[in-house]
Amino acid sequence: MQYREYGKTGMRLSTLGYGCMRLPSVDGEVDEDEAIRCLREAVERGVNYFDTAWFYHGGNSEIVLGRALKDGYRERIFLSTKNKEKTTDGKKWRSLLDEQLVKLDVDYLDVYHFHGINWEQWTEKLSVPGGPLDEMRNAQKEGIVKHCAFSFHGDAGDVMKLVDTGEFDGMLVQYNLLDRSNEEGIAYANSKGMGVIVMGPVGGGRLGGASKALQEMIPGDVKSTPEA
């Protein structure tokens, strides 16, 4: 496994992380035993960054990941989750953080994201006095959150504005061969010393799955787009 620095945090993260939005499932429910096996196998193979969120798998992703991190696995990885609240109410935002710590059954988070934010939400809600940003700082002072970050699905121009606030240690953005809209923002964040995590590196499977058109054009058993 290869590892890279996450901005100025001192964290060295595996270049391949484990996103827990889609864990092994049967009939729409998480197959807990198989999920725990897969998560722990990833740790054994060198993966040390695990990312989840409050509503993944109907709220069960954090619970299952927390169980997988028992027996000494928590100490071997960096844990990230996200707060979905887009509110001016800092206490409401903090309440969700406290709930997530219980679900994960951990004492602290290595990275905590403002989930899927845009510039308007940041300026009008999340960063107002007494709001979520103030509670994020309180959580950091308490040692509950190590590093503050944001995840992003919006207009690419907002990325650089958010970076320029100077409030974040890192960010999580979409980037792959099919979607390079955040390329400039990623380079800018790097130039400012921020950590960057990429989501969807294979386009939700579109870049890894076999293409029907290519299968018809190319003889043999094509298993993936890169192979073709």
State the predicted function of each range.
Residues 1-77:
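N-terminal binding-site loop/beta-alpha segment at the start of enzyme catalytic domains
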Residues 21-33, 81-91, 120-124, 151, ...:
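Active-site mouth loops of central-metabolism enzymes
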Residues 44, 140, 191-194, 201, ...:
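Conserved short secondary-structure transition element at the edge of the structured enzyme core
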Residues 55, 153-157, 202-203:
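Short glycine-enriched loops at secondary-structure junctions
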Residues 56, 72-94, 115-116:
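Structural motif corresponding to the early beta-alpha repeats
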Residues 66-67, 163-165, 186-188, 211-215:
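Short low-complexity, flexible loop/linker segments enriched in glycine and/or proline
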